[in-house]
């Protein structure tokens, strides 16, 4: 059993291709074929189904979740699908980090994950699938301020004439993070929390006013207008954290969770079959939840 434990941890937690571990074992006198490993994984895969269901059931008891998705390769032909591009979805909450490998990036995927729930908050980027899911399920979306910050940094890097203007917005966002951190530090003190919440609210109102003024400026650069239009359009979701202090300002939690799997994707190129893709998602879920 220790051999299988090492194989699973080495590949799915540390992201190392299995053949490298097998080569190192062979140098120590232990010759295990890749076919033996694949057959063993196929035998083990169904054993984790009850555990995956338990993780899902437990996660459904939470009130909010971080969600993200990234590309993945699955090298088994699927009827009706022209490419081998699949998607690794991650849902992170206080109780679990749940991974799901699916052939689609459509809203139907997160809708299926949250099936049976009638309310909740999903912290996510501005991808349209989450918006459709929220409308279908009646969920609330909390959008990511880190993505907004990146919008302004991209402007600063791509348009020298907008650098000072863009970095002023980056500074405003930094102040927002600081003020929110200060208010969260005094949650146990009702008076101090109310005072610091008012400070955050005033800063948000100031940012909102700056946004409106920029959009009223007919001379505003088109690239800057696009960023400001998005900011205004997503403002409600970017403000959810005010009424829900347990909601983070960004989706870094989900993005951090998927970093290890992304390293694995680069090292072993994806999954050779559908069952191995499902096993991969199970192993990511178990190992990263328990890590």
What are the residue ranges of the model-derived segments?
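Catalytic center-proximal scaffold of phosphoryl-transfer enzymes
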Residues: 1-291
């Amino acid at each position: 059993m220790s051999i299988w434990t090492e194989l699973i941890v080495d590949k799915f937690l540390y992201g190392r291709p299995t053949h490298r571990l097998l080569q190192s074992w062979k140098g120590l006198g232990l010759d295990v074929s890749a076919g033996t490993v694949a057959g063993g994984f196929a035998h083990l895969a169904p054993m984790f189904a009850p555990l995956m269901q338990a993780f899902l059931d437990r996660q459904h008891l939470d009130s909010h979740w971080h969600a993200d998705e990234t590309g993945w390769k699955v090298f088994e032909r699927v009827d009706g699908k022209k490419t081998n591009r699949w998607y690794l979805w991650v849902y992170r909450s206080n109780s679990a980090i749940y991974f799901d490998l699916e052939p689609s990036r459509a809203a139907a995927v997160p809708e299926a994950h949250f099936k049976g729930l009638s309310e909740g908050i999903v912290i996510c980027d501005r991808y349209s699938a989450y918006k459709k899911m929220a409308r279908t399920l009646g969920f609330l979306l909390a959008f990511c301020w880190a993505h907004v910050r990146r919008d302004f940094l991209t402007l600063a890097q791509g348009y020298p004439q907008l650098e000072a203007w863009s970095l002023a917005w980056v500074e405003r966002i930094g102040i927002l993070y600081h003020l929110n951190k200060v208010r969260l530090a005094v949650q146990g003190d009702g008076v101090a929390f109310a005072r610091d919440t008012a400070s955050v609210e005033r800063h948000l109102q100031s940012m909102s006013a700056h946004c409106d003024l920029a959009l009223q400026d007919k001379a505003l650069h088109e690239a800057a207008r696009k960023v400001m239009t998005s900011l205004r359009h997503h403002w409600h979701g970017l403000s959810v954290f005010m009424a829900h202090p347990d909601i983070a300002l960004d989706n870094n939690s989900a993005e951090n969770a998927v970093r290890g799997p992304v390293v694995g994707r680069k090292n072993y190129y994806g999954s050779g079959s559908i069952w191995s893709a499902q096993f991969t998602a199970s192993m990511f879920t178990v190992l990263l939840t328990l890590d």
